[in-house]
């Protein structure tokens, strides 16, 4: 349905929806009482999943006799997969395999409410939670009565993460130099067209931000080997004191910042001074506080670098833009909401009297007009190729950590994915790359001796010919005593690579068939994809050619054992259980090893490389600010998004409903002793509720009153529980913002919840992302958006 034709149809559809909601009880059904509580989870985070498993285990250990046990029902596909699965079970009235609880977003409550399957948490104490984070329950359509239907157990918000070294390079080149109004001489990091005229404002906020930008560049410049820049310093010693003064900026133009600028310049290229762009522009900290100024500044920067505005067909190794946006629906929703004064009456739709009202957008009211303004601001940046948007799993942090973006807007839950390690490693595919995934094993080529250098051990010749490669995984089936014994057994055990050694075991990859003596899932995986097979074989042949001379030399010197060992260590691919996305080119899905809870991928056609630290963004080099909270700088209200899954109840039957609420109350209110899993706290324990344990484990925040009431919230809760080296600055910023929400200092935004809100969100995001690629104008964007919505809205 297209809005410009469909006023009558649209109103009719909403009326029909209201009727369906009112008649929801007709679709209500009871589930079979099977004596257990099922919790549906589609979590993709390993830390969150492990925490949930620990919680279920703990509850089943401490529950009273006669209380129902709880178990996890795993759903694939993330939150969208969970939404689809629930809708299907509601539609078919699944009485036997449905669940009692689900971790997902509150629009599912509306889906349940349409058929009377929502479960209010009437017997759950929620008084420990800040009421501001429960009021979204007042904005859920189709429910039968007011109440608490969703409980936020893992909140996050969005931050603007600035790549300090990159922004320093941009501003340092654009800045007016002290005493150089007509000075042509430039530093070695500047090009012939880069004599800057930009000025930095002197207000307190801007001065503080500029110092942070300087400090991040210094830290980045220090990260490589010391002394590299000192030679260049000596060469410049012939400059007179006057010349040195002229080439210095008001900031500390130290060797460290110069090292950083020089490194960034390698990928960003020369700064170009352009009339009406950054020429005579005044840089202020307030630029990052509102959408209009942020997008205007970003567009100006994009126009100043040829590698951005002249490149409309970016490859993975290219600079991706100035601004990265991980969730375009979030950015569009919050900017339009802010432009409407933080009032849901001025938003795309609102929930009123239990019904969703989309008339504001349909009638081209304030939300439509504000969307047009916001889109216009984005359009300038889009046209100059200055924005990167996440189109399905490729997050801004994947590029920002390699200096390919100046700043990005992303979730506070992504802190541990946002920065490079001290030794930044990635897999390069030639024209693109990915950061070296966690939980990754190297795939070794089979040796001429047999399976990875071992004797045949009864395997057939065909089995050897079918062998593509091997990798090792931890052998969880081996008793700890055996592992300890093997660790002390010396070099002989460690060299026995083809058999179970230490706490590892070898997994064999075969084509065509798995030979006798090997078992699929236990110690073998059958590779079926022809592309994977060919690339593994090709990599093995390539390695053989490269090492022929060396292997021959080793044989001549009668060092055959060393040659065999070297041959067996050839890397021809990688395999991981981390959440990397299949691309059908270099990354493919393969079968899991028995006991694994996460999908396994195989990565082929990649070369591992380790970069200098100055080529990457470390957490201490990022400047973390709130995502823009206003549309215009002068707007009276500041807006912050709150997001994250809720625990949602589903009607089953009288007994299971009571047992479900009993578990949720325990989850929120019963302190238990939990063993910590983080490296720095391994073996230690802490007493806290299951909800607190879950939020901490998953890098989320539980909106407890006591947290927001403390004056030292930032320092107490900002410390990262996973490593002593890094402080979770994203969590610090989230707590700071949530505290302001709790104290009514800023306005919280979350999507009004309707059974159609998920489709509305998905459609506006997909259509905007397509407009970024096609550079569509606003009219075309709206036309495509409404067409995508179809008759559902």
UniProtKB/Swiss-Prot annotation:
Lipidation positions, renumbered (N-palmitoyl cysteine): 23
Domain of life: Bacteria
Principal subcellular localization: membrane
Topology within the bilayer: Lipid-anchor
Ranges of biased composition (kind: Low complexity): 491-504
GO cellular component term of the entry, any: plasma membrane
Keyword Cell membrane: yes
Entry's family note: Belongs to the MG185/MG260 family.
Record protein name field: Uncharacterized lipoprotein MPN_506
Organism this protein belongs to: Mycoplasma pneumoniae (strain ATCC 29342 / M129 / Subtype 1)
């Amino acid at each position: 349905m297209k809005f410009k034709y469909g006023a009558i149809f649209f109103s009719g559809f909403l009326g029909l929806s209201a009727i369906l909601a009112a008649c929801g009880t007709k679709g209500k059904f009871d589930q079979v009482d099977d004596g257990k509580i099922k919790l549906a989870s589609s979590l993709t985070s390993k830390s969150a999943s492990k925490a949930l498993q620990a919680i279920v285990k703990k509850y089943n250990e401490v529950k009273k006799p006669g209380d129902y046990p709880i178990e996890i029902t795993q759903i694939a596909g993330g939150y969208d997969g969970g939404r689809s699965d629930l809708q299907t079970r509601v539609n078919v009235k699944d009485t036997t395999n449905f669940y009692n609880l689900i971790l997902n977003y509150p629009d599912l409550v509306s889906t349940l409410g349409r058929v009377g399957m929502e479960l209010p948490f009437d017997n759950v104490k929620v008084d420990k939670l800040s009421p501001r984070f429960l009021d979204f329950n007042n904005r859920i359509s189709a429910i039968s009565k007011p109440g608490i239907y969703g409980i936020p157990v893992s909140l996050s918000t969005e931050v603007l993460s600035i790549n300090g070294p990159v922004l320093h390079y941009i501003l340092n080149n654009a800045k007016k130099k002290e005493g150089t109004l007509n000075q042509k001489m430039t530093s070695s990091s500047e090009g012939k067209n880069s004599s800057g005229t930009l000025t930095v404002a002197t207000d307190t906020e801007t001065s503080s931000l500029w110092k942070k930008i300087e400090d991040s560049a210094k830290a980045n410049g220090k990260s490589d080997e010391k002394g590299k820049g000192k030679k260049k310093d000596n060469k410049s010693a012939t400059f007179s004191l006057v010349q040195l003064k002229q080439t210095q900026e008001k900031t500390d133009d130290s060797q460290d910042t110069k090292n950083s600028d020089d490194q960034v310049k390698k990928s960003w290229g020369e700064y170009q001074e352009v009339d009406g762009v950054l020429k005579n522009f005044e840089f202020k900290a307030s630029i990052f506080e509102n959408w209009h100024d942020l997008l205007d500044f970003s567009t100006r920067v994009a126009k100043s670098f040829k590698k951005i505005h002249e490149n409309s067909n970016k490859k993975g190794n290219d600079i991706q833009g100035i601004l990265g946006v991980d969730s375009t629906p979030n950015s569009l929703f919050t900017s339009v909401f802010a432009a409407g004064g933080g009032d849901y009456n001025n938003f795309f739709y609102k929930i009123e009297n239990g019904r969703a009202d989309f008339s504001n957008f349909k009638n081209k009211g304030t939300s439509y007009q504000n969307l047009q303004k916001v889109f216009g601001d984005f359009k300038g940046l889009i046209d100059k190729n200055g924005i990167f948007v996440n189109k399905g799993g490729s997050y801004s942090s994947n590029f920002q950590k390699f200096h390919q973006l100046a700043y990005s807007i992303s979730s506070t839950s992504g802190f541990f994915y946002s920065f490079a390690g001290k030794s930044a490693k990635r897999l390069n595919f030639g024209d693109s790359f990915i950061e070296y995934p966690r939980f990754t094993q190297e795939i070794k080529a089979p040796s001429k001796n047999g399976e990875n250098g071992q004797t045949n051990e009864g395997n057939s010749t065909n089995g050897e010919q079918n062998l593509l490669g091997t990798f090792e995984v931890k052998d969880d089936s081996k008793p700890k005593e055996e592992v300890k014994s093997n660790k002390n057994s010396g070099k002989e055990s460690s060299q026995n690579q083809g058999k179970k050694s230490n706490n590892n075991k070898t997994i064999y990859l075969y084509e065509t068939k798995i030979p006798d003596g090997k078992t699929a899932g236990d110690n073998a995986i059958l590779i079926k994809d022809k592309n994977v097979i060919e690339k593994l074989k090709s990599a093995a042949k390539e390695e053989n050619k490269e090492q022929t001379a060396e292997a021959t030399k080793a044989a001549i010197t009668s060092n055959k054992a060393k040659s065999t060992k070297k041959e067996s260590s050839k890397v021809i691919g990688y395999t991981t259980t981390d959440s990397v996305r299949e691309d059908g080119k270099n990354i493919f899905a393969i079968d899991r090893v028995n006991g694994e809870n996460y999908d396994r991928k195989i990565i082929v056609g990649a070369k591992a490389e380790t970069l200098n630290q100055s080529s990457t963004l470390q957490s201490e080099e990022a400047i973390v600010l709130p995502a823009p909270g206003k549309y215009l700088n002068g707007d009276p209200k500041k807006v912050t998004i709150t997001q994250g899954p809720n625990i949602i109840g589903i009607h089953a039957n009288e007994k299971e409903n009571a047992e479900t609420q009993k578990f949720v109350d325990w989850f929120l209110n019963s302190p238990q002793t939990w063993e910590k899993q983080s490296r720095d706290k391994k073996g230690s324990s802490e007493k806290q509720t299951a909800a607190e344990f879950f939020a901490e484990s998953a890098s989320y925040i539980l909106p407890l009153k006591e947290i927001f009431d403390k004056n030292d919230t930032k320092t107490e809760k900002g410390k990262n529980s996973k490593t002593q080296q890094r402080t979770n600055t994203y969590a610090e910023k989230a707590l700071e913002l949530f505290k302001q929400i709790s104290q009514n200092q800023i306005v919280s935004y979350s999507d009004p919840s309707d059974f159609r809100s998920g489709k509305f969100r998905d459609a506006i995001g997909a259509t905007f992302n397509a407009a970024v690629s096609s550079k569509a104008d606003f009219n075309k964007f709206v036309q495509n958006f409404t067409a995508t919505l179809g008759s559902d809205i």
